[in-house]
Each structure stands twice: as structure tokens, then as C-alpha cells.
Design a protein with these regions (language model features):
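Pyridoxal 5′-phosphate
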Residues: 1-241
Length: 241
């Protein structure tokens, strides 16, 4: 990226125009949360100034228009990850999406003695809900280890899949190392062992093309605030069976 284009991009982010300790702000924490461009700030302002109303709960003009905007956003998200709108559930963030799966599908299907497979590379939001579920259901958790290069050990995965786990939940891209896991191949192996797969795509969807139809995962989660969107909005993709 040349200097002129870089400057044009910076201009789209009002917060980056401020200074910190007398110096121009350089923000390097987008893996935690991204800053918001003026187009997003303007869209939020426009909604609250011109459309603010409950969605799917009224027949007056504002409610109808707000519902249209809400469903148009769902259609945009569905197209972005190559799926249908009826497989997109809006939640507050990826953490809530994972907990929703844990407290609905998993609570009904993971029983005493069953195994859940995770990896050592997971964010706590993709560990704690499964630990709580395992304690509640009497299930076991197996972890795919990370090697000295920060790569998931595929031999560990092969061994754990021999236990016929009910669920394999793992991150597409590490929030710590940036490691890109071979998700499609890992999902295929998990399905062959009879497991459903939840993919934490909070770090991948903002930065790379993600096609849920091609990946063939059963659940996928991500957050708006990590991809230039506002806080308080996230997505749970759930494949219809």
C-alpha cells in the first residue's frame, strides 16, 4: 500500500486523527477490536435519527422500515459467507453465539461419557462454555495440542477422533499467533468420525474469504466489532439439518 492510499484509509477513521502523548495514534490492536470508519458511524447515526423502532414488532412506518433494514443486513451477512438468510442468527458477539450452541444443541445432545474436542489454541470464549457443559453432562474434553511452531498437531486430532466425539470446536485463525488452521480438512475428518463442528471465525471472517458452504461446518461464529462494525452485534451461522 503506497503512502497516498494509506493516508486515504486513515482519513476514514475519525479516532485515528487524534494524538496520544503528543504523537499521531498508531492502533495495532484490531485483533481485540477494530476501529470504526465514518461510514459505520454515519449509518448508526442515520438509523437512530430516522428509523429507530423495534423490528418485527410493529406495523407502523418506522417499525416496518427498521425491520427492512434489519433483514437487509441479514441478507448482506448471508451473502458475505455464502449461505441463506434462514441460517443466520444475530447475537451480541461470538461469545454469546458459542454459549447459545452450548446451551441449546449441545445440552440436548452431549451426554454422560461423550467427548468434546477442543484445541490448545482456543480463546477462552471457546473453552469455558464447553467446560461448563462437560461438568453438567458428565462429558469429557480432549485437547488438540499445539506444536513448537504454533501449529495444531493433526496426529492429536486423529487420535481424539477415534473416540467418536459429539462435537469438535476450534478456531479458524488464532487470535494470538495468527496461525491459519486447515479448517476444511479438519472439518472433513471430524464429520467422518461422526462429530458436528463449530468453527470460531472471529479472526478469519474480517480478513479472508470464508465460504461456509465450501467449509461444510455445522456452526460458525464471528463478531461485528472485530470487522469495523459496532459493538453488540455478532453472528451465529447454523446449518439446517
Amino acid at each position: 500500500m503506497n503512502e497516498r492510499i494509506f493516508a486515504q484509509v486513515r482519513q476514514q477513521f475519525p479516532l485515528l486523527q487524534r494524538t496520544v502523548n503528543g504523537k499521531r495514534l498508531v492502533y495495532l490492536d484490531s485483533a481485540a477490536t477494530s476501529q470504526k470508519p465514518v461510514s459505520v458511524l454515519d449509518a448508526e447515526r442515520t438509523f437512530y435519527q430516522t428509523l429507530n423502532a423495534n423490528v418485527h414488532r410493529g406495523v407502523h412506518t418506522l417499525s416496518v422500515k427498521a425491520t427492512e433494514a434489519y433483514e437487509n443486513a441479514r441478507a448482506t451477512v448471508a451473502k458475505f459467507i455464502n449461505t441463506d438468510t434462514d441460517q443466520i442468527v444475530f447475537v451480541r458477539n461470538a461469545t454469546e453465539a458459542i454459549n447459545l450452541v452450548a446451551r441449546t444443541w449441545a445440552r440436548q445432545n452431549v451426554k454422560n461419557g461423550d467427548m468434546i474436542v477442543l484445541t490448545q489454541a482456543e480463546h477462552h470464549s471457546n473453552i469455558v462454555p464447553w467446560q461448563e457443559l462437560a461438568k453438567e453432562a458428565g462429558a469429557r474434553i480432549g485437547y488438540v495440542r499445539v506444536d513448537e511452531n504454533g501449529v495444531l498437531r493433526q496426529d492429536d486430532l486423529a487420535e481424539l477422533l477415534q473416540h467418536k466425539p459429539k462435537l469438535f470446536a476450534f478456531t479458524h485463525v488464532s487470535n494470538v499467533l495468527g496461525t491459519i488452521n486447515p479448517a476444511k480438512d479438519m472439518i472433513r475428518k471430524a464429520h467422518a468420525a461422526g462429530a458436528l463442528v463449530l468453527l470460531d471465525a472471529a479472526q478469519s471472517v474480517p480478513h479472508m474469504a470464508v465460504d461456509v458452504d465450501d467449509l461444510d461446518c455445522d456452526f460458525m461464529v464471528f463478531s461485528g466489532h472485530k470487522m469495523l462494525g459496532p459493538m453488540g452485534i455478532g453472528v451465529l451461522y447454523g446449518r439446517k439439518k
